[in-house]
Amino acid sequence: LVIPGGAGETFMQTQDTATLNWIRKIDKTTKYTTSVCTGSWILGAAGLLKDKNATSNWYRADEVLKMYGAKFKEARWVSDGKYWTSAGVSAGIDMSLAIIDDLLGRKYTESVMLDLEYDPKPPYNAGVPSKTDPLVLDMMKEMYDMLMLPLIQGEQAKRKLK
């Protein structure tokens, strides 16, 4: 099972009982239950990451995953039993290759990497908050805050009332 992420719509899915129930049902049949980016928020909301190590997109990852009982790890991808989570979208590729390796071994994984010509060389070393120019990081946080913060704070308030 692969749960993709995104922005506002992803967080809205954390509130959708039908979606969460479907994920819980399918999870009982999977060898791997995975997420890419903020898809881990949905797995968390389904209760599948409680007391599990997990990661997510950098934006408020620690705060949101803790809200669902997960233990945030700052990493490209994290596996904890059958639960595999990746940080951003490009980290999902790395996680997918690690799953292929887990299933089929190094030679097969290398053949997939060759077929994809997967040899990333980004133009800047700035793909995580600790390596990003502080001005760029602040700008991105402000942009995401305008979209996401009201949703996150609303969920936190609901949880405090329970």
Describe each PLM feature range.
Residues 1-162:
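Active-site-adjacent pocket-lining segments in enzyme domains
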